[in-house]
Structure formats: C-alpha cells, structure tokens
Amino acid sequence: VQASLAKKQAVRVRFGHRGEGGTWHDWSGTVKDFQPAGPDTIRVQAVGLEQALIDTTVTEAMHGEPADVVARRLLASTGLPVAEIRIPAETFPHIVFSHVTVARAIKQLAASLERSFGHDLSRHAVWLGESGLYWSDGDEPGEVFVVETAANLITNSPNPAGMSVAVSTILPGLTHSREVRIRDTRRDFSELVRAEEVIHTLGTDGNTTTIGYGYDGGWG
C-alpha cells in the first residue's frame, strides 16, 4: 500500500450512519505525509482542499477596484470555486499584495477595510463549503443540526469569554459555519449557534463530533 501512496495524492474519507435513512459525510483532501505505524499499518496525514489558501501565493497591484472584486480575484487564484463574498463594497484607490499567501492577502484586505473605512469584520470567516469558498458573516447553507440532552449531546462547556465547546455523537455532514441548535437541559441552555470549529473523531473508543462556537479567534 505504501508504494502506491504519494504526497499531494487525492484522498477521500467517507463516514456516516449505515442502514435505511443513513447519513454520510464525504471529506476530500490530499496526502501531506505518511509513515509506517505498525507491521501492517500505515498512518496517512491528509489536509483539506482549503490548504490551497496557504499554499498559493499572489503578487498583485490593483487600482480603483471594489473590495469584493479584489477578494474574488484573490480567492479564485487558489483554483477552487468561489461561492459567495459578502463584504463591504468599498473601493480601494490602490492596493498591493507582494508575494503573500492568499490567506495572508485576505487578512490584509480585511485589515484595510477595518482601518481605512471603519468596518467591523469580526464575524466574517473564510471557509470552503459545499459550493466553494466563502468569505462572509453568514452561515453555510443547509439544515440546522440539533444537539440535545438525552439524544446526542455528550458534554457542553459554554464559555462567555472565549470559545465554547460541545461534544456530541458523530454528526456526519456538519461543517464549518453551519448552524447548530444546542439544547442542554442540565444547564438550562438553548441557543442557535454557528459552528466556528468542527472536529470529527472516529476511533475504537467511540465516534464523536466536537463543535467550537461563540468565539472566532482568527485564522491565517
């Protein structure tokens, strides 16, 4: 098996619930590294397709372009489809990106919108959704996931000063920026939140989904 593996090779991971009405989740990425983990086992480390935001560098000088046009050109340079850009439509007389990653260029553009025009982009995020790349303060389109006591909620740790964390049984299909309704009767807690971080864990000790919500500490 190891002989057939190569770095940057396409990878697809599929997991979910079997049986009638089962829900499945397909994750796509590329091989970052691999090494033996036992006599008949290979450990493969893979990264998501959004890695292109960090691997792609840009050098651009733009004049008199609206911010959303600049953002679309930056995101499109990754080779990934661009689904939606929802940012203030300010026009920059001149803006330069000098051999920086796309992620860094987007941060530079966001900082310019905040510093030069006084906009608050603290709720905005960049993510790769079902239809492509988003830069928006909205949510990923799709159904609202429900996590609740006596059904699938394992633990819930609200943190008013930082990132709150809820752990549930596995939730195939849940991705960044999807809406989640958390009902924790033990804490008398019921809120509709935006998933700022999603970690699916599959293992011999059980399958869980960890959801970070309520605070976005930044990226890139």
What positions do the PLM features span?
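Glycine-rich loop/hinge motif
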Residues: 59-60
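An acidic/polar, Gly/Ser/Thr-rich interaction patch typically located in mid-to-C-terminal regions
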Residues: 1-6, 120, 129-130, 135-220
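Short beta-strand-centered interaction patches in the first periplasmic/extracellular domains
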Residues: 41-53, 78, 82-156
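Glycine-rich, acidic and aromatic/proline-enriched surface loops and short helix-turn segments
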Residues: 36-37, 67-83
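Extracytoplasmic/secreted envelope proteins and their assembly/folding machinery
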Residues: 28, 68-72, 103-107
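Assembly/oligomerization scaffold segments
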Residues: 1-51, 162-164, 194, 198, ...
